[in-house]
Amino acid sequence: MAKVRVYELAKEFGVESKVVLATLKEMGEFVRSASSTVEPPVIRRLKDKFPTEGGAASRPAPAVKPGPRLPQGARPGPAPAARPQAPAPAQPAPPQPAPAAASTPAPAPAPAPRPAEPAANPAPAAPPAFQAPAPAPAERPAAAQRPAAPAPQRPAPAGRPSTPPVSGGPGQGPRPGARPGGPGAPGARPGAPGAGGPGARRPGPGDRPERSERPDRGDRPQGDRPRSDRPQGERQQGDRPQGDRPGRPGAPGGAPRPGAGAPRPGNNPFAPSQGMPRSQGDRPGGAPRPGNNPFASNQGMPRPQGGPRPTPAGPGGPRPGGPRPNPGMMPARPTVGRPGAGPGAGRPGAPGRGGPGGARGGAGGGFAGRPGGPSAGGGGGGFAGRPGGGGGGPRGNRGGTQGAFGRAGGRPVRGRKSKRAKRQEYEAMQAPAVGGVSVRHGDGTTVLRIRRGASLSDFAERIDADPAALVTILFHLGEMATATQSLDEDTFQLLGGELGYVIEVVSPEDEERELLAGFSIDLDAELEAEGDDDLSARPPVVTVMGHVDHGKTKLLDAIRSSDVVAKEAGGITQHIGAYQVVKEHEGIERPITFIDTPGHEAFTAMRARGAKVTDIAILVVAADDGVMPQTIEALNHAQAADVPIVVAVNKVDKEGANPDKVRQQLTEYNLVAEEYGGDTMFVDVSARQGTGLDSLLEAVLLTADASLDLRANSDKDARGIAIEGNLDKGRGPVATVLVQSGTLHVGDAIVAGTGYGRVRAMLDENGDAVQEATPSRPVQVLGLTSVPGAGDTFLVAPDDRTARQIAEKREAQERNAALAKARKRITLEDFTKALQQGKVETLNLILKGDGAGSVEALEDALFKIDVGDEVELRVIDRGVGAVTKNNVNLAVASNAIIIGFNVRPEQQTKEYADREGVDIRFYSVIYAAIEDVEASLKGLLKPEFEEVQLGTAEVREIFRSSKFGNIAGTLVRSGLIRRNSKARVLRRGVVHGDNLTIESLRRFKDDATEVREGYECGIGLGSYNDLQVDDVIETYEMQEKPRG
């Protein structure tokens, strides 16, 4: 599913990209540029910010609707002047479509086609047309966009070919080509479609002037309008020949173009005279040539009087308009012109109105161009371009003059910086420098929400910074990381605090909510939309919790009349089991769903998971043991999940059982029995003898009816949670799921955790196949691609593709979070110590188990083993199922040990592991696995030595020897003095000599190995001679310290 980019949103909202970028920044969503992608949840929030803009941008302005009055505007009588439209610089526009549509409401008062009559009074509809936004080119029904050849309203003669338009620019609409055939073939007249003039309109058949009238119109100017005032969107024609054209049949003999020998007006932007030569007299008021200066008070072309009109070539003559343009003739940087009216663009026969920049219109608008003639711009009141003709640009392939006197619209010139670019440059200059790099800082309150396992690249994108700069800053803060490495929350907090940002790591629940929102799945909205009519009663979900060996599974076995304890290794539960039993209550058979959780301390996560999905918790406490540590922990889980608790006092048949003691102990934890005035139900049961079971089930149903609203919508796609998962050799991945709402059917496309697929089969707790599972029904699901983790949510997707995409995104999130969690933060000090002390010892493990919950519990228990920082424990792979050859290959490559929990390898795999020397350990009880791994970790520790004092000797006399130096005559006060042991000299309690060695030890004249307390001896300390009487010589040795 393609993501939407910022500029696409800006186009949809009808605003500029920088407005959308600024809005995203205000919303706390920092994006780098207009080409950055935006997530669907952010798009929805953004659309709330632009409710009207988005709607206006998607509809064309009503001012440009073509109406049935189109033939009426074709009469070249008095009409309103060209109305300037708000330019749309980023969109190519056909030449001046907006004025053509805007001038529709002005009816022509005279049916005679007299273009010489100026329009003195413009129509009152002009101001609204100026305020109308310029619509997109595809939505402009301007006449210039319609080819003239197939127009049905115009009675064109037969044999009139439609020449394809010459591509001159993005704003050029289709123009009719030259008409080589037939006398009287009309060119584009004032008001005809395809003309570049702003008032051009398609005439109706009844309003069209006869061809015989054309020779009488001697008041038309000869030649082209200057190019300096043309809108930038007009096409540029290169060096098409612009000389005299042969006469047209029906016209008085091909009159030559006046001024043909002179240079083409508009050719030189630096010439003193621009535009068309005057036909008669002086310009009014002696003003400069119109079209020369965009800032002049007078714009547009005065209408010269007299002179024959040049005509295109007849049949058999040279191709009118010159050769077809090619890319070499095009200007270097064509820019998009103003759609609508340029400066002074006037309708034929009407005075030109001013364009942008405050310039007023000229004395009169020009005529539309002829087919086959040179194309003129739509601005400046001159003659509009001739469709199909050559450009009015300079000759000699020297490029156009556009931009020489300012730009009528379009993108800024290369090198000119936008306001946004200047602002970013200013912010970069003002940004404080950390470690030699400048990064934009926050104000200390700016909140950045970052997903789990994000990298520095993600962080840099949020604050619009360079990832390399963040790597440098992090290095100066004492942390080493790459730009794409997944980092933990502490590292981001450190970096955010330095840069002035408040870092918030998105919780897994929020990540899941945003992920599903990208696929238009909102679970919260589904729950809110459900009414009372949609809900139906469902069975209660009851979790059995308590301390290990207090009889939880035995109690469930007694309720279900089965024997699960015998199947569990070591007699302790190491999986979550889900069952459903039916109890008759008040004459109605009511099902109850039971979830059995382990009680060992290693299964804390399982108990917490069981408490989250339950409605009622049964706290099992042995009457002989009382309240134990895991009892308190299970109680805290249930209270944290805010579920009602029913206490089952088990083993009341044992000798020494005291149920009242249990009631008293639980009072300290806010569980007050009903007989003591509380609201908690206590039931005395004996799982071994089967007593009190009915009372327990009745207590569960009474609690459910009294304090819970157990209803769910079963008429929708299933939603729920995966309680347990395992890999079956014949069935593949098998997930035990609990449906919380909706109904799960065989054949549904399901996604559970990182696994997805279609439900191939569903089995109940007895192994029987079921076709559907209603709310509160636990079933085993077959057909997933991988084993889901215990506690993963599952849902039914609309199709397989959506399920696969959700699973892949979940997998990526979990992988990044796991990488961030497994990353060992290496500071510069740690790195230096590692270099000095050598390689850090690491124990690599590969965990394989029979269930996802068991593997998770084993991994958590192993990571809790604390043996110091010198040894590192790494779990490089974990999985559900038997040990495979791939596991052995990974163990060979990484020097790892494989731990199998309730699994065994194939014979071939075992032989392969023996050949490769891979150590595989198998365990069926979690205690043994934890103890062995802890012993292995301690074996990797380097030995620690501690100082053990051997004895002390007091110096009584000093003997000086030239051969041995000073020798101390001493009396052993305590312990013993041993030859070659370490020694130090103490003088009045202060160490004067340390790290010495007793090199000689004699008893009288005999060498001695050791001298005990109460004996005298002579001690030589080698080269150390600073000895005095009453000094104390203390001896010690370094002994290895046991690691524990």
Curated annotation (Swiss-Prot):
Its main location: cytoplasm. Residues 413-422 have a biased composition (Basic residues). Residues 31-425 are annotated as: Disordered. GTP binds at residues 546-553, 596-600, 650-653. GO terms for cellular component: cytosol. The keyword Cytoplasm applies. Residues 117-148, 285-304, 329-338 have a biased composition (Low complexity). Residues 537-709 form the tr-type G domain. One of its GO terms (molecular function) is translation initiation factor activity. The keyword Protein biosynthesis applies. Residues 546-553 are annotated as: G1. This is Translation initiation factor IF-2. It comes from Kineococcus radiotolerans (strain ATCC BAA-149 / DSM 14245 / SRS30216). The lineage of its organism: Bacteria, Bacillati, Actinomycetota, Actinomycetes, Kineosporiales.
